[in-house]
């Protein structure tokens, strides 16, 4: 988006490759990851995500931003990695199917780097569908539902959550407790390690 001080490039994943949990979001937010260069950093969704990761011992800090409103350099992840179905800022903040297809190879590489039996958390239906496409599964065989767990043929476990967007939390489609419950389900079934 050509704004001064913005990262405005494809946003790379954050966290160690091959971690036991891969969190897949939708796309970089206009004034979030598009500005900071880190997934879920600088927008409301990131505040909920990183505070939840910190609560469960998966992040060293709850705050994605530092005092200068930049990506918190002291924040690191343990046992998890964060990526998006689309790596670039989409028009109107919603990716088109062609963009999802274009970026799906990157997501397939992320999935291939995961250890056997790893967990994948899809934040929203678009991320859910992108994970299924990248892992060569049919969407009709794995219906999206909040806090659902799907066993994929490649040994991965796919978990679903409503996206942690401001809209979903303001409308109470997703509450903090509901989001925490998803992480509790994941941690119940997986020992997360870097």
Identify what each model region corresponds to:
Residues 1-144, 152-193:
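A polyanion-binding, active-site-adjacent surface
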């Amino acid at each position: 988006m050509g704004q001064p001080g913005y990262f405005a490039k494809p946003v790379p994943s954050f966290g160690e490759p091959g971690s036991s949990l891969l969190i897949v979001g939708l796309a970089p937010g206009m004034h979030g990851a598009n500005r900071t260069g880190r997934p879920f950093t600088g927008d409301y969704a990131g505040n909920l995500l990183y505070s939840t990761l910190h609560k469960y011992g998966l992040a060293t800090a709850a705050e994605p931003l530092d005092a200068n409103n930049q990506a918190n350099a002291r924040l690191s992840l343990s046992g998890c990695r964060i990526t998006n179905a689309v790596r670039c800022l989409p028009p109107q903040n919603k990716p088109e199917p062609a963009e999802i297809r274009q970026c799906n190879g990157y997501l397939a590489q992320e999935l291939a780097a995961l250890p056997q039996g790893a967990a994948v958390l899809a934040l929203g239906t678009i991320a859910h569908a992108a994970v299924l496409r990248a892992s060569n599964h049919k969407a009709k065989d794995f219906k999206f539902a909040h806090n659902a767990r799907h066993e994929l043929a490649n040994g991965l476990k796919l978990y679903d959550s409503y996206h942690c967007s401001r809209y979903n939390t303001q409308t109470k489609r997703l509450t903090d407790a509901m989001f925490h419950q998803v992480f509790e389900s994941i941690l119940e079934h997986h020992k997360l390690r870097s």
